[in-house]
């Protein structure tokens, strides 16, 4: 009996060992599958050498943000991919700035901003001016203590929303009236702006251009204002107004041409809008960060026909040009008080006092005035005096 029991125990032990062998050693096909698997832990050195593979990293397996970054090697492209990647969390890239809190959604995210910040990614401080604001100031923006503040150009007032600007009188600057637009469309000649004027000497000869900044003040170049002692302003064919006083910029340098600006005060104001309309002078920050970059301007004025001004005003579309390139092309020094504009054609003999204006949300602003005519037939570029840099001086003289 004892022998039978021992024999039975041996048989059971043999079966157990056989099952253990089957569970430890896999059949050949399964074993081969194991051998063919990509062993990430043992291939770390190779993965660091070669750029990541998107299919292997993020589609055969679920990847993290760092692995996706290895594939694209570019933060912007990686963030865009990560927002669309089904297996990833958009919040991993920490899109919410200034200690904002990120919340994941299906293929998107939202930010809860810290106090004092706003915007999709909490990038904008509520008390600062930002170009990205779609609901910001129509004209000028100023940082405040708890919120930014808006202001308007001369002749406008803030709307109820404290952001929009509406004309408050008939001489509101840079606002083309329906009457002027109708006259422009019916004219057979090139269109002109109601703020453009010509300077005339005592013999009735036109010699320079200017621009109306206020109903009783005209901006021209210092050089033009000093050419004759008896100057009149011609706003249209029938009306000529004599100059009461001339205000040349105190730092005008005749030799270098620096600060080549002058304000001419009229003996009597022009009648708005029938005889003319002022153009708006932009604040410096608004001009240099909002108005000018990447926008198209209009060069307007008259060209020289021999030694005389042509009778028909001209217009030419221009864009801001690189200062270094402009300086090399024109062989001039571009300073903080000058700017360059580039046209689509070679510049003709534009007369001194011709101007560049830009339209912003229905209002026209003055950004440059021409001090010297360009070299004939040589370049598409012009060097102008940067008008916004003198806005405070204008206010002091015209107050």
From Swiss-Prot:
InterPro entries: Coagulation_fac-like_Gla_dom, EGF-like_Ca-bd_dom, EGF-like_dom, EGF-type_Asp/Asn_hydroxyl_site, GLA-like_dom_SF, GLA_domain, Pept_S1A_FX, Peptidase_S1_coag_factors
Keywords: Blood coagulation, Calcium, Cleavage on pair of basic residues, Disulfide bond, EGF-like domain, Gamma-carboxyglutamic acid, Glycoprotein, Hemostasis, Hydroxylation, Repeat, Secreted, Serine protease homolog, Signal
GO molecular-function term, one example from the UniProt record: serine-type endopeptidase activity
PTM sites of type 4-carboxyglutamate: 47-48, 55, 57, 60-61, 66-67, 70, 73, 80
Glycosites: 99, 230, 305, 331
Residue ranges occupied by any Gla domain in the UniProt entry: 41-86
Subcellular location(s) of the protein: Secreted
Residue intervals of the EGF-like domain: 87-123, 125-166
Transmembrane stretches, start-end: none
Domain of life: Eukaryota
Entry comment on modification after translation: The iron and 2-oxoglutarate dependent 3-hydroxylation of aspartate and asparagine is (R) stereospecific within EGF domains.
Domain Peptidase S1: residue ranges: 172-399
Residues with the (3R)-3-hydroxyaspartate modification: 104
Tissues where the protein occurs: Plasma.
Propeptide residue intervals: 23-40
SS bond list: 58-63, 91-102, 96-111, 113-122, 129-141, 137-150, 152-165, 208-224, 326-340
GO biological process, any: blood coagulation
UniProt signal peptide: 1-22
Gene Ontology CC entries for this record: extracellular region
Record family assignment: Belongs to the peptidase S1 family.
Function statement: Appears to assist hemostasis by binding thrombin and promoting its association with phospholipid vesicles. Inhibits activity of the coagulation protease factor Xa in the presence of SERPINA10, calcium and phospholipids.
UniProt cross-references to PANTHER family, sorted A to Z: COAGULATION FACTOR (PTHR24278), VITAMIN K-DEPENDENT PROTEIN Z (PTHR24278:SF20)
Name of this chain's protein: Vitamin K-dependent protein Z
Name of the gene encoding the protein in the UniProt record: Proz
